[in-house]
Amino acid sequence: MASPDLFPNVSFSHVSVPAAAGASTEVTGGATAVFGGDASTGAPRLSLVWSGETQAKHTLEIDLSDAQIFKLGPTEWLCVSGESEAKDGVEEKSYSRAIKVVLRTEAESKAFYLAFQQWKHRVISGKAGEPLENGLIIGSKSKFDTKIEASSAKMYFHYYGQLLHQQNMLQDFVRTGTYYAAVMENRSDFEGRVVVDVGAGSGILSLFAAQAGARHVYAVEASEMAEHAQRLISGNPSLGQRITVIKGKVEEVELPEKADILISEPMGTLLVNERMLESYVIARDRFLVPGGKMFPTTGRIHMAPFSDEYLYVEMANKALFWQQHNFFGVDLTPLHGSAFQGYFSQPVVDAFDPRLLVSPPTFHTLDFTTMKEEELYEIDIPLNFVASVGTRVHGLACWFDVLFNGSTVQRWLTTAPGSPTTHWYQLRCILSQPLYVMAGQEITGRLHLVAHSAQSYTIYLTMSAKMWGEGAEQGGILQTSTAKLELKEPYYRLSQPQPYVMQQDQQQQQLPSLQPQSPLWDYHYGQD
């Protein structure tokens, strides 16, 4: 095979009814199948080129925009397209044309199918051969397109189509090293298996899977990073010969075979940001064999109330600008309240000291192997904590971990405070009205995440605690604070002062450190 888009020495024949012009054509072993774009319109086409008895070149072209392909055998495919004839400029007759194409080997047959699908879903914007625009695919709307704004998708694919952002993730050695260890420690799950890399990015996870002995890896990537992945994989030929890069969304592409294992890095801030987990679940339903494995297998969102006076004051002070009564002769104070609430609508992304937690954390589990995609549209988590110290509660701290449930080793990737920092950091939702609690007091509430079309979530947080004292025998006075935050617009507080430390009289009841040697870590995170 000369190239992924050219297939020499194929056989083909017409099998259409009623017969189209030239329907009696049958070529055995002497034709060349070429995928490409129309020179004038850029429309994707399959051209079958052969020489006749007089050595004259003949070409049969199939418009892929409305074509379908069906497998007849290991090396045989049926390409069906709709056509119409026109007489005197008037469309007169419509019919379907079916071309049976026979490849030389199963490997070429598989590559032919992949080329058919990739060219069918490709957008040629301008002349053939011009770069494709990020994030655009022709054809009927997929599930991704119906739930995600086109502008958001375009920005998303543009972002991940740049090598500098891929480098940022690759240099997260906690992330990359954990994936590598999870794959290599579970070679038995990969050896001789078919793997699909969902959202392959640079292709690094596909290369890991090939190192672990995968029979074949399909690296599916919708952004322009697919071209970079192809170059990286081609530059590692001993592994790359078992990897096929497919440019497209997992909701739209077709694969020639089912996968034994899916591998992906679909996690965003708070685990669910960017909504790629939904694509991961869709890929499971479309491509994974029954009982197949998923790396990662499950994810957990961890939550605990926190106290951080320094952070609260920092956020509140941001709105002081709007308390000016004479800003070039203008009174800004009418907007102070809105500005104050606006700053508190931003989740804070940073790394914080676990000693700021007011109680042991709880967690909410997402099982990627069984959950439905729709369960990710709205996530409702009840909150119930018991304060370990008496202090002011300034909000809810969140982080996540994921489990690679291999047959040999079960490995966790955690973003917990106190553990090695990742590019995800941790996330905190701040209450504009803090709560006052005493040691042993119950803190209740609700964390409600609602997905939206900008590939993120709106966060609705409610936290409550009872104020004891006069009238406590009747149950006390319930104090409640709420917040509405936008996960897509966080405050990245990556260069911050030392965290606020609780008062000396609070230190005796401090929480155990969230480190592997502590009982709290063992309970929540587990070890190999």
UniProtKB/Swiss-Prot annotation:
Higher taxonomy: Eukaryota, Viridiplantae, Streptophyta, Embryophyta, Tracheophyta
Name of the protein in its database record: Probable histone-arginine methyltransferase CARM1
Segments of this protein annotated with the region Disordered: 500-528
PANTHER family reported in the protein's UniProt record: HISTONE-ARGININE METHYLTRANSFERASE CARMER-RELATED, PROTEIN ARGININE N-METHYLTRANSFERASE
Family label: Belongs to the class I-like SAM-binding methyltransferase superfamily. Protein arginine N-methyltransferase family.
Task performed by this protein: Methylates (mono- and asymmetric dimethylation) the guanidino nitrogens of arginyl residues in several proteins involved in DNA packaging, transcription regulation, and mRNA stability. Recruited to promoters upon gene activation, methylates histone H3 and activates transcription via chromatin remodeling.
GO molecular function, a single term: protein-arginine omega-N asymmetric methyltransferase activity
Gene3D superfamilies on file: Hnrnp arginine n-methyltransferase1 (2.70.160.11), Vaccinia Virus protein VP39 (3.40.50.150)
Example GO biological process: methylation
CDD domains: AdoMet_MTases
EC number: 2.1.1.319
Biased composition (Low complexity): 500-520
Localization, UniProt: Nucleus; Cytoplasm
One Pfam family here: PRMT_C
Residues that coordinate or bind S-adenosyl-L-methionine: Q166, R175, G199, E221, E251, S279
GO CC annotation terms, alphabetical: cytoplasm; nucleus
InterPro entries from the UniProt entry: Arg_MeTrfase, PRMT_dom, SAM-dependent_MTases_sf
Protein source organism: Oryza sativa subsp. japonica
Top-level taxon: Eukaryota
Gene name, Swiss-Prot/TrEMBL: CARM1
Reaction equation(s) it catalyzes: L-arginyl-[protein] + 2 S-adenosyl-L-methionine = N(omega),N(omega)-dimethyl-L-arginyl-[protein] + 2 S-adenosyl-L-homocysteine + 2 H(+)
Keyword entries, A-Z: Chromatin regulator, Cytoplasm, Methyltransferase, Nucleus, S-adenosyl-L-methionine, Transcription, Transcription regulation, Transferase
Occurrences of domain SAM-dependent MTase PRMT-type (ranges): 149-464
